[in-house]
Amino acid sequence: MTESERCKMPNMTIKDIARISGCSVSTISRVINDRPDVRPETKEHILQIMRESGFVPNTNARQLKIQQSRSLVFVVKGTRNLFFSDFLVQLQRAATLYGYSGIVSYLDENANEIDAAEKILREIKPKGMIFLGGSVTNFQKGFANITVPSVLATLVSDELDFPNLSMVGVDDRASAHTAVAHLIAQGHQKIAVLGGPATSFPSRMRRLGAQDAMEDAGLRFDDTLYGLSNYDFESAYHAMNGLLAKRAEFTALFAMSDVIAVGAIRALVSAGLRVPEDVSVIGFDGITMSRYCVPVITTIVQPSEQIALQSVELLVRQIEHGAPAQTVTLQPELQPGESVRPCRGNF
């Protein structure tokens, strides 16, 4: 396409830039946000196309004027979930790139997200909804009443099947298997686990993944080494203290979130134990805080930017083109830190 042809294209979008450049939407997003993980020649190629086409990200006056008619609602279940806090930044950015504004609705962990969504639909009338977290049971019972295109982000379940509900996330069971297998590879056999109850789908899948890894290694999953914790610092701190009070013997801990890992590490240190010298700890999520803890937490990183972009892209396709719902499972990454070391025996 020549420069003159590009200049004739009105209302260019990020999808147009991706198509013309031959790059992915996520790559265009990284260039717009001046991310360093783009090759210089690719970045210059994309910027040249933007200059020639007169493309400007959708933060101009025209976009603000139509913002109300192009709104999405992000229903966040869990006010203290730091992964969701990090993820929301990516989600808002992705929505803006596609020309939509995001309205955030925070709910307590025990709230019914479907009831809240029905109320939002009556009051705001958004074009679509993205749920961050949720109860599979609540969706099974009430999602049929949600009439707008929707996406369940960070959770993928084969127990849900609705024509207007896409899902984007990682395989929680396989990801937990990776985490615990990493501990086992370091020689750990007595592994404690901190996570939520079986009524929580992610917690249930992550527990099964931990069990799978231990069984694959010929080890027994010890139910007495499982501590119930919400996904917040205080709950994790008390859950770890509960395990320590029972004089449970373990050399490693799989925490079902980085927040749980931080709370647990604080309890271990308060009890006079060292991480990782006495107890190795691996987390889950890859939140920013995990990289600034002492020690740096070894964790399973959920690709939050990819999840956000895929979630918004699927939602926009449903809204603008009537596309069918899809399920997208993305691959997490084991990010080594300083909180895991080879086993040296029980503490």
Named regions from a protein language model:
Residues 1-9, 67-181, 245:
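Alpha-helical recognition/docking segments in bacterial nutrient-uptake
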Residues 24, 70, 127, 188-190, ...:
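Short acidic/polar active-site loop segments enriched in Thr and Asp
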Residues 77-86, 104-113, 155, 167-178, ...:
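Hinge/beta->alpha junction and helix N-cap segments in small-molecule ligand-binding domains
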Residues 189-190, 221-225, 275-280:
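Short acidic capping loops at alpha-helix termini that bridge into adjacent secondary structure
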